[in-house]
Each structure stands twice: as C-alpha cells, then as structure tokens.
A protein has these predicted regions:
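Membrane-embedded and interfacial regions of multi-pass energy-transducing membrane proteins
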Residues: 1-347
C-alpha cells in the first residue's frame, strides 16, 4: 500500500482538488470546442450560439469559466504548502514537475481568455503579442501575420485544445514521481511515522472533493460573473479601447511586474525568472535553507512576508501604470526578491 505521512493536514488536499478541477476543465472545454468557430468574424457569435441554442451550453460555459479561478487558487495553495514545509528538499523532482504543470496551465488560461473574442480578449492578445516581440521571430509565427487576426485565433484555439493533453501527461508523471518518492511530511515528525493511504486518507480526500464541489456549485450558481470583466461582453471593435486592459486576477501578480519594469524585454525576462526561480529551491538552498518554516523562525516570517507581498501585487495589478503606482510596484518587486533570496539562504 502507498505509505503517507501521518501528520498531513488539509493543506495536502489541494493536490487532488486541483487535479479534479483540471479534468473538469478538460471535459467542459471539449464540449465547448465542438461548437466554437475560431474566426474573428464568427468567434463572438459562436459563443452567443453556445449560450442560447446549445443544450446545456450556458452551463458548460459557466462551469468552464468559473472553475478556472479555483484551479489557480488550489494550485497556488498546493505550491505554497510545498514551499512552507520544505518539500523541495525531499521530493525535488515532484516539485519540478509541478512547476511545469503550473506554467502550462498559465499558457492554457491565457489562450482561453482570448477565444471568446470580446473587447478585453482582443486587446489582451494585442498586449501579449507585443510582449512576445522581444523574442525574434515569435510574433509572425503566433499571429500568422503582422497583427492579431483570424490566423491568430485559429492558432490560439489549436494550442488551447492541445496543451491540456500535455497537462494531463505532466499530471500523470507528477503523481508517478510522488508515488515513487512518497509525500513529504511536516519536519520534526520523522519519515517513518506513516500510515496507509487507504482507508484513512481516501476518506480525507473524499471530504475535500465534496467540499470543493459545494464551493464550485455555489460559485457557478450565484457568482459566475463576479470575477468577469464587463468589457469582455462587448464585441471586438478596433475603435474602442477599454479604459484599462486588465487580465484575470491570477495573472495580476505578473502584470504588476511588467508595469513596474520600463523595458519590455527586461520586464519579460524578470517575469519568467520570477517563476523559474522556484525550480532552484532544491539545489540553491543552503543547509539551513532546506528546513521548512515550521522549524525555522526566520523562514517562517519570511514566508508570511512573501505571502503579503503577493496579495499586495494583486492590488497593484489593477491600478493604472502611472505616477506613484509604478514606484509601489518596484518596491513590491524588491521586497519579493529579498524574500525569495532570504528563503533560499535560510534567514
């Protein structure tokens, strides 16, 4: 039987929650893709067709758009749990695969945000393609031309439909590595203090799945447009620009980084490095940095300071990139880098 730590808490339930939500997204996305038309003249009206004429089309659309937020909430909580308890020191390959899944999920979410072809979708695609112009030769391949057009939507649709296959494969490897190395336990409890996965943790995961299902049904039933942008309900018009082009809330942290760096290429590199540095935790940590936050007082407070800075970046991401907000964003970036370096070195 698969041995699991006896000291697991509810933080260990986020893995199965995020996995179940990802597969829910794959199922609803497949059903929606059967009726979607990847063309700039038909994409918006195909979404309206799904709403009004496809049986349970509005339900599929609402579930697919609403579950995206819980996916990133559970994935980020799952990732922060591994950092807090020092899992990168014991199951490094598992964490590396998890970071790969996180990056692929970000790409899928961005591609999916463009497909409804509302006003915010169009200008969001324009901003990101301009950002990718810092890499030579990428923009003509992504756009299929010199600007965002029908080939762009077709490419985004194909990539958005193909990447979930890569995600499911990465999740399989993630679980295989986990079963080979076993889950990490809270530091101080010992590695031999373990119990069988069945039946104790099966019941625990089942309770977590039922709780997540209740929360998801509540959001789909009562708060489906709570996190939506009103501008994205309007059809694309190149003559109309939203007052502020804002991505989904789970991208606001990275959007605040881009607005804080004046150079386009440098901002892109900082944003990529901001994510990739998570892969270096297992190798770059000093001996004192390998300990989890529960046994290291300095890392304990550093982790909470980093968490507060991330919440602050979400607020910064919705502000206009002007005046004092640029300075605030640079201050956040400095604090965040200091926290990450301090966490690696164990102070």
């Amino acid at each position: 039987m698969y041995p699991c730590p006896k000291s697991t808490s509810n933080h260990w339930n986020m893995g199965i929650l995020s996995g179940s939500m990802v597969y829910t997204q794959v199922l609803t996305g497949t059903l929606l893709g059967l009726h979607y038309t990847p063309d700039i003249y038909s994409a918006y009206y195909s979404v309206i067709h799904i709403y009004r004429e496809v049986y349970y089309g509005s339900l599929y659309r609402y579930v697919h758009s609403s579950v995206a937020s819980p996916v990133f909430t559970t994935v980020c909580t799952h990732l922060s749990r591994g950092i807090f308890h020092g899992s990168y020191a014991y199951v490094y390959s598992v964490m590396w695969m998890g970071i790969a899944v996180f990056l692929v999920l970000m790409a899928i979410a961005y591609m999916g945000y463009v497909l409804p072809w509302g006003s915010m979708s169009y200008w969001g695609a324009t901003v990101i393609t301009n950002l990718l112009s810092s890499i030579p030769g990428v923009v003509p391949w992504v756009c299929g031309g010199f600007h965002v057009s029908s080939p762009t939507v077709s490419r985004y649709y194909i990539i958005h439909s193909t990447l979930p296959v890569l995600t499911t494969g990465s999740l399989v490897f993630h679980v295989l590595y986990l079963h080979r190395l076993s889950s990490s336990s809270n530091p101080g409890y010992g590695t031999n203090n373990r119990i069988h996965f069945y039946t104790w943790l099966v019941h625990k995961d089942t309770l977590a799945l039922v709780s997540g299902l209740v929360v998801t049904i509540t959001q789909v039933s009562y708060g489906v447009i709570m996190l939506a942008h009103p501008d994205n309900t309007l059809e694309v018009s190149v003559l109309y620009t939203p007052l502020h082009i804002v991505p989904e809330w789970y991208f606001l942290e990275f959007y605040s980084i881009l607005k804080s760096i004046p150079g386009r290429s440098s901002g892109f590199l900082v944003m990529i490095s901001y994510i990739y540095v998570l892969n270096t935790y297992g190798e770059a940590c000093t001996p004192s940095g390998l300990a989890g936050c529960t046994v290291h007082t300095g890392k304990y407070y550093t982790w909470y300071l980093l968490s507060v800075s991330v919440l602050y970046s979400l607020w910064m991401g919705v502000q206009l990139p002007q005046g004092e907000y640029i300075s605030y964003g640079r201050g956040y970036l400095m604090v965040s880098i200091w926290c990450r370096v301090g966490y690696i070195n164990g102070f």
